[in-house]
Design a protein with these regions (language model features):
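The conserved cystathionine-beta-synthase
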Residues: 20-37, 43-44, 91-109, 116, ...
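A short helix-to-beta-strand capping loop
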Residues: 14, 37-38
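Short active-site-adjacent helix-start/loop capping segments
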Residues: 28, 49-50, 61
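A glycine-centered beta-loop-beta connector
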Residues: 33, 41-57, 105, 113-130
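Short, flexible active-site loop motifs that bind/organize anionic cofactors or intermediates
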Residues: 16-19, 48, 91, 121
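Tandem CBS (Bateman) regulatory domains
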Residues: 1-16, 54-90, 97, 102-106, ...
Length: 141
């Protein structure tokens, strides 16, 4: 267990991360979610990460109350990621201990957390599966 206590996000994160642009359509995002086994994508504007978009953000587009008219499906899929993304997002840096990452995931019910370097550039992403791998590695000693 001691190994897990010392492990960092940088040691277990996925370094090659797929991102989406702010002007990606919901239709394109839907195809990406179908093709990949990801819960969320960092949203980029140039080299900067300006938010995240998750399955939950995508699904919120389709939640309506009886007072609102339901827009056409094609109209919803034509919306841009910028319209539904979460611009205020939680992230960690590569030196963040996995114990802290795990606590953030539990507290905020997150499946993955972007990892940004000192210049706030995307360094990777760490998912629940990465935490599980670290725990398994630690148990093996």
């Amino acid at each position: 267990m001691h190994r897990f206590l010392e492990a960092t996000a940088g040691q277990y994160m996925t370094r090659k991360v797929k991102t989406v642009a702010r002007d990606t359509t919901m239709r394109e995002l839907h195809k990406m979610f179908e093709a990949d086994d990801f819960n969320c994508y960092p949203v980029r504007e140039g080299d900067d990460i300006v938010g995240v978009v998750s399955h939950f953000d995508f699904l919120k587009c389709f939640a309506f109350n009886p007072v609102r008219m339901v827009p056409a499906y094609d109209d919803l899929l034509s919306r841009m990621v910028a319209d539904v993304m979460t611009p205020e997002f939680i992230y960690v840096d590569p030196a963040t201990k996995l114990t802290r990452v795990l606590q953030l995931m539990v507290d905020h019910r997150m499946k993955s957390v972007p990892v940004l370097d000192a210049e706030h550039r995307l360094a990777g992403i760490i998912a629940r599966e990465d935490i599980m791998r670290a725990l398994t590695d630690s148990a093996r000693g």
